[in-house]
Amino acid sequence: MSRRHAAEKRVILPDMKYNSILLSRFINNIMKEGKKALAEKIVYSAFNKIEKKHRVDPYQAFNNAMHNVKPHLEVTSVRVGGANYQVPTHVDERRGYALASRWIINAASKRSEKMMIDKLAEELFEASNNRGVAIKKKEDTHKMAEANKAFSHFSPKKMK
């Protein structure tokens, strides 16, 4: 690992339809083997399904889902005196949204519907209403951080 300087953050262009960088990152996370057009088709079709089935603004539902699933705390493993401790740390905004999108995509892919479009639409709608597997994952992460609050003085970086 280089000690000279941190890697530059790549500039991600906003998506064409909603002009959102967050949605563009989400599409990039959906993408497999460089097939971005297919990933965009999946996401936009899921948005259409949300709009038709639940009669809500799909972009607003997406933003609510991402905000609801985004964790505020997580645990990091720190080695102190030969023992590993799970230390609760704050999650910065960029990592929080990255975790949220990953959890939503994983929860959607494990759903029972046949097509990814249906799976993603239902998971996004449920997450926007504070339900679903992705919300459970966030709550479990927060419970883990709360349970290990006693080790917060071992924090590897300053708590914000």
UniProtKB/Swiss-Prot annotation:
One of its GO terms (biological process) is translation. The keyword 4Fe-4S does not apply. The keyword tRNA-binding applies. GO terms for molecular function: rRNA binding; structural constituent of ribosome; tRNA binding. Keywords: Ribonucleoprotein, Ribosomal protein, RNA-binding, rRNA-binding, tRNA-binding. GO terms for cellular component: small ribosomal subunit. Gene3D superfamilies: Ribosomal protein S7 domain (1.10.455.10). One of the primary rRNA binding proteins, it binds directly to 16S rRNA where it nucleates assembly of the head domain of the 30S subunit. Is located at the subunit interface close to the decoding center, probably blocks exit of the E-site tRNA. Belongs to the universal ribosomal protein uS7 family. Part of the 30S ribosomal subunit. Contacts proteins S9 and S11. This is Small ribosomal subunit protein uS7. It comes from Rickettsia rickettsii (strain Sheila Smith).
